[in-house]
């Protein structure tokens, strides 16, 4: 089924599911799209990455993961259907965090002293990059929802 606005509005309410909350732990992930530019509630510019999970590591509970992936009808979602988000503030004092992620965790070459790349140049190379992401659970501001957030990333190899 399509995910267009119209098709979502036409979907029977019995087919609407909450996003899957994967268990806390470390997951192998892949980037399938360019990050989106956005702003925080306070107006700070940021880049939002969406990571798709490809596999759990040994610190993820198999029982908790199976429970999280089980639909109401008993069938299992594919882990590859699950994504998590991670933001980087795009401020002068936080730019190093984005650079560290791109160079250290994704292995994107930043160029040389004589011919350095810009962060924008490096961002053009993110699609298809794999890495590890550690997922934690955080409550929403209103306390009604729990979100799976990435608190740190690491190189895969």
Model-derived features with residue positions:
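Short beta-rich binding modules
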Residues: 1-157
């Amino acid at each position: 089924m399509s995910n267009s606005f119209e098709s979502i509005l036409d979907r029977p309410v019995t087919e609407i599911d909450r996003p899957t909350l994967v268990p806390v732990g470390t997951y192998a992930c892949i980037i399938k799209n360019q990050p989106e530019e956005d702003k925080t509630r306070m107006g700070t510019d940021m880049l939002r990455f969406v990571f798709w999970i490809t596999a759990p590591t040994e610190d993820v509970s198999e029982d908790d993961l199976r429970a999280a992936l089980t639909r109401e009808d008993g069938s299992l979602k594919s882990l590859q259907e699950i994504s998590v988000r991670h933001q980087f503030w795009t401020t002068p004092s936080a730019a190093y965090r984005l650079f560290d992620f791109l160079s250290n965790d994704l292995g994107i070459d930043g160029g040389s002293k004589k011919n350095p790349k810009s962060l924008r140049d490096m961002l053009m190379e993110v699609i298809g990059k794999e890495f590890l992401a550690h997922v934690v659970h955080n409550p929403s501001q209103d306390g009604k929802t729990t979100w799976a957030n990435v608190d740190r990333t690491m190189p895969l190899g």
